[in-house]
Amino acid sequence: MTKAKFIKFVIATILAIVALYLPYESLGFDAASPMGILNPLEIRVIGVFVMAALFWILQPFPIWSTSMLVIVLMIITMSDSSLSPFRVDGVTMISHKSIMATFANPIIMLFLGGFFLAAAATKYKLDLNLARVLLKPFGKNPKFVLLGLMLITAVFSMFMSNTATAAMMLAILAPVLKLFDENDRGKAAFALAIPLGANIGGMGTPIGTPPNAIALGALNDAIARGDLAANPVSFGQWMAFGVPYVIILMVVAWILLMKIYPIKMKEMVLNIEGAGKFDTSPKAIIVYITFVLCVLLWVTGKGVHGINDNAIAMIPMAVFALTGVITKKDLNEMSWDVLWLVAGGFALGVGLNATGLAAHLIKTIPFASWSPVALMVGCGIICLFMANFMSHTSTATLLVPILCAVGIACQDNLVGLGGVTALLVSVAFASSLGMSMPISTPPNALAHATGYTDTKGMAITGVVMGLLGLVLSWGMMILLANIHFFGTPEVKAAEAAPAAVEAPAPAAAVVDTAAAVAADSTVALPADSAAKVEVVDSAAAASAAEAK
């Protein structure tokens, strides 16, 4: 560990310890206050949350290792398997199984299935050959080739990791960038087109980028638990609004790049190294069929064929493993760190939900007095700002559990803007729109490393696209609300919300093993002041997960 990282570690640790010993009673959390007294488990969750947030922002350790630390700390200090000195009389500890279950959360399986598809596509050059075929219609005019590169990058990013997509497309682009004259600023437009396409394209599908999956998991789980009166959002529904949103942003980004970096080159020929005829080997054909099958199943939705989106993601896992398409070596090279990072966020959500801390925190802020517009705009801007300086996944992991609880508490006020669904989707999009600096996203860093981009141009492009993207997402959510895309709000939405905000969970909240399986990163609000966190058996949890 370097000296700088050690200093960051010490600062974050000290602040987390301070959070554990703050005089919360003097801050309003006392018996006489409607907010009530924080129990020891709630205070420990605050300490872990502060530590995780600072570690994710300052990064004294890899961000995925912070998630692992979160899970371990929760198990040994808050669970029914914690060390004896941490047991609290009169307070039911969180089930250790519910914390561990975050590693096998259905959203984790959805992402893992996406990793299998991406690895197989790369291994059998499906990505390169698709790029060759799809770029052909854009001709040799540099302006249209630029648009083509952006759109193709966006399409790949919908099903592959943003980083892998950017790395692949920059490799394709590398020989072309060398063809530009020294004084032709157009080369910067091409270099920036790749991270823009990767960052924006990932918003088109639930598996395109982790913030989407985190928001979708939080939303659908809240609906399954009955905390939210809305319809679950399927893979196909997400694409129905996500893909048009991506296309509009891509066109805007294309025009913006040409304005900032005029292209002088008159003709351009792309020779994609490694691409050729499509592989017709048996394993390659298995990849093609499985890829098309999964996409079709996701797009058509559970209502047509009956298979849950998360279950569909397991099809390529089984098929590719049994046929040898994916080997042990391929498995070892997958981005397990991303899955562990997301699992840590889900574990925080379990802690917030199970201890009743979310309800306490909500009562400290008069969200009910906020206008729905102020709530949505404020959350979006905060999320966008944070996403420019820290991991997009970390940003969503920190904010989604809290904002889900806030949205549930104020769901009657949000109906005109699309409800809690609109709030969480716009927050997920805001997390992906933070791309104004080289450190904002891995695709930005890769593009900056080519030497063809400058920080100023990246900042201008990133800020403009971030703000335009936010405004467009709000407008889209309002439009979808007016056409009842997410379903007609039920009366219970207005009835359940006040009860949920009325009182925090009691200190003796009962938490069961499977609560987290159904809760993930979401934060459930109790129904009344005498309510306890409902005891859910494993069968009920499986049913809740299937309800997604």
Per-range role (PLM):
Residues 36-39, 51-69, 75, 99, ...:
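Flexible hinge motifs at transmembrane-helix junctions and intramembrane kinks/re-entrant loops
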